[in-house]
Amino acid sequence: MKPRIDDTRFGSITLEGKISEHDIIIRLNGQVEKRKKKLSKAVYGTSHIISLDEAKYIFENGAERLVIGTGQQGLVKLSSEAAEYLQRVKCQVELLPTPEAIQTWNEAKGSVIGLFHVTC
């Protein structure tokens, strides 16, 4: 079951009353896990550009939509390689500042996964 996101503030995100003080990924089955930022940092030296390797890690077969919370000020971007990959696997991507992305997430229906950056 898809967890509801209650709130986000700089440095944290709250799901179903539980606060996480790190970036998260939400899987198709509703499982919440810590984002593997090192997959992008290894390529770009920052976690603000999502690499192809990270996009492949995030994507799950069956996901039709990916909601990305790009941070409180919206600094996270997809690399061109990551964008091309997600287009190839027919996964619609929505990049929104995290406060807006949580609203989109909570209203989302169907096969949706999420990545939420909690700073910047």
Task: For every predicted segment, state its role.
Residues 1-41:
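N-terminal, charge-rich interaction modules
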Residues 35, 74-78, 104:
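Short active-site-adjacent helix-start/loop capping segments
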Residues 18-20, 58-62, 107-110:
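Flexible, charged surface loops at secondary-structure boundaries
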Residues 92-102:
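A short glycine-rich beta-strand->turn/loop micro-motif centered on a GG-aromatic cluster
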Residues 58-94:
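Mid-chain, well-packed structural core segment of small domains
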